């Protein structure tokens, strides 16, 4: 049974900075509440209260909410309208799909002078003959009933027919109350019968049979007998699950009436199933075998249960291994446990192992683990156990000359790129064409280039009649 608590109200009051005393609106729908309590003491300033889709069977503990304007109690188990006289500012009341059969209980709403909207659709009383006329005549302050506006002519007609309608409503109420009494008695008998069947089924289940077996000669079970026992346990577990499935199927296929008792029974059945499922999952987690990190033969296995990204670098220059494990950035370092062994490394991340076999032996006492503050990665440096002598590459003379003995002076000096001076020379554009030029002295004269003497070809004929070419 879920009850109204201060923690629940504060969680539903986030829009008001989790303040309860000044809260004006709160929604407590679908919380499986069976009672209304503490709200009138903690939230005196409430104007809107949502309590739909719960298991509330009685209207109570709301009379001190003097500023309450809207109360929603749809989809509950309410059978009678009561305890609302103190809600002086109540303007809208929603009792859609409840079990209100006592229609004469609406007389208690005559003191709510501000009531303008009223919803009773989906209740047994809404099927009574003359239901609407009776409500309109009983509550003259109403303007809307079940989402339909009340006209003046309808109000006058309801007031005129009120004596006849009141008698009909009284007869239908008595018939419904007798029916409800029979339903309650039947539900009580069914509940008692199911409890007896449950006790019998519990007694038939295998368990302690009140006898002790202390045979000293049989303290170590036979392997064959042990295998048979495990197989029998698996068979029993499968049979138990099949029985649960059949029981659930039978429950949902069983016809039942829509009553407050059936709603409560369904809710409790679902709660039991949910709890049994949680317990079963916890038991399965407990029964889960531990992860094998080292086999019986002594072989170390690679394990990455957390599925973290990692990289293992062989730093030959420094003769060490560097492991970079991508730990979550916001994970607390106290949840990490690093264990470096000569042949492997194991890291526990929130009790989940990460184990990696190393290519060569390392020195555990000289290893170091560091955590990055920006990325959160775990970097483990593991020096190799066998030291290797390696030759370093000699620096070239040009680099050696440029190395500075005083690093502070080297930082201040500007290094320039050395280039061959000939490569920087600018080409002489004026002397691109190598040709002698003649310059005239004095008055302007026309200079012609001297004709070049060329040898005559063999077929040349000197004809005097042909004039010379100028």
Curated annotation (Swiss-Prot):
Biological processes, Gene Ontology terms: axonemal dynein complex assembly; cerebrospinal fluid circulation; epithelial cilium movement involved in determination of left/right asymmetry; epithelial cilium movement involved in extracellular fluid movement; establishment of localization in cell; flagellated sperm motility; outer dynein arm assembly; protein localization to cilium
SUPFAM superfamilies for this protein: L domain-like
Domain LRRCT stretches: 128-146
Coiled-coil ranges (or none): 177-288
Keywords, sorted A to Z: Cell projection, Cilium, Coiled coil, Cytoplasm, Flagellum, Leucine-rich repeat, Repeat
SMART domains: LRR_SD22, LRRcap
Region named Disordered: 182-265, 447-470
Any one of the GO CC terms: cytosol
Residue ranges constituting the CS domain according to the UniProt record: 303-395
InterPro entries linked to this entry: CS_DNAAF11_C, Leu-rich_rpt, LRR_dom_sf, U2A'_phosphoprotein32A_C
Residue intervals passing through the bilayer: none
Residue ranges of LRR repeats: 20-43, 44-65, 66-89, 90-110
Residue spans of biased composition, Basic and acidic residues class: 194-213
Compartments reported by the entry: Cytoplasm; Cell projection, Cilium; Dynein axonemal particle; Cell projection, Cilium, Flagellum
PANTHER family reported in the protein's UniProt record: CILIA- AND FLAGELLA-ASSOCIATED PROTEIN 410-RELATED, LEUCINE RICH REPEAT PROTEIN
Protein role: Involved in dynein arm assembly, is important for expression and transporting outer dynein arm (ODA) proteins from the cytoplasm to the cilia.
Family that this chain belongs to: Belongs to the tilB family.
Protein name: Dynein axonemal assembly factor 11
């Amino acid at each position: 049974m879920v009850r109204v608590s201060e923690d629940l109200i504060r969680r539903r009051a986030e829009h008001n900075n989790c303040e309860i005393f000044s809260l004006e609106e709160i929604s407590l729908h679908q919380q499986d509440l069976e009672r209304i309590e503490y709200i009138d003491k903690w939230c005196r300033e409430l104007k809107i209260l949502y309590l739909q889709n719960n298991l509330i069977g009685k209207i109570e503990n709301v009379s001190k909410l003097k500023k309450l304007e809207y109360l929603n109690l749809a989809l509950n188990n309410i059978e009678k309208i009561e305890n609302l006289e103190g809600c002086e500012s109540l303007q809208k009341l929603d009792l859609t799909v409840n079990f209100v059969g006592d229609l004469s209980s609406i007389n208690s709403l005559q003191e709510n002078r501000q009531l303008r909207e009223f919803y009773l659709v989906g209740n047994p009383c809404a099927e009574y003959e003359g239901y609407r006329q009776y409500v309109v005549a009983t509550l003259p302050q109403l303007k809307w009933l079940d989402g339909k506006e009340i006209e003046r002519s309808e109000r006058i007609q309801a007031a005129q027919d009120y004596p006849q309608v009141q008698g009909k409503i009284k007869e239908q109420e008595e018939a419904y109350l007798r029916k409800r009494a029979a339903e309650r008695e039947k539900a009580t008998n069914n509940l008692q019968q199911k409890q007896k069947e449950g006790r019998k089924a519990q007694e038939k289940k295998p368990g302690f049979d009140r006898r002790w077996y202390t045979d000293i000669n049989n303290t170590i079970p036979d392997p064959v007998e042990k295998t048979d026992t495990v197989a029998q346990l698996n068979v029993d577990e499968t049979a138990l699950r099949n029985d649960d499935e059949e029981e659930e199927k039978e429950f949902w296929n069983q016809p039942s009436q829509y009553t407050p008792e059936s709603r409560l029974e369904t809710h409790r059945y679902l709660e039991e199933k949910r709890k049994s499922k949680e317990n079963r999952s916890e038991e399965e987690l407990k029964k889960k075998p531990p992860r094998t990190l080292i086999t019986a033969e002594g072989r170390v296995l690679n394990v990455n249960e957390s599925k973290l990204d990692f990289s293992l670098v062989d730093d030959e220059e420094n003769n060490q291994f560097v492991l970079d494990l991508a730990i979550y950035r916001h994970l607390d370092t106290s949840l990490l446990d690093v264990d470096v062994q000569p042949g492997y490394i194991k890291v526990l991340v929130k009790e989940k192992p990460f184990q990696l076999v190393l290519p060569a032996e390392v020195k555990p006492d000289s290893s170091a683990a560091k955590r990055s503050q920006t990325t959160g990665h775990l970097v483990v440096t593991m020096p190799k156990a066998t030291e290797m002598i390696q030759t370093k590459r000699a620096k070239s003379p040009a680099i050696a000359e440029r190395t500075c003995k005083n690093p502070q002076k080297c930082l201040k000096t500007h290094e320039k790129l050395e280039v061959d001076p000939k490569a920087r020379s600018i080409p002489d554009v004026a002397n691109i064409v190598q040709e002698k030029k003649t310059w005239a002295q004095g008055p302007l004269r026309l200079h012609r280039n001297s004709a070049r003497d060329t040898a005559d070809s063999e077929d040349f004929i000197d004809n005097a009649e042909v004039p010379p070419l100028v």
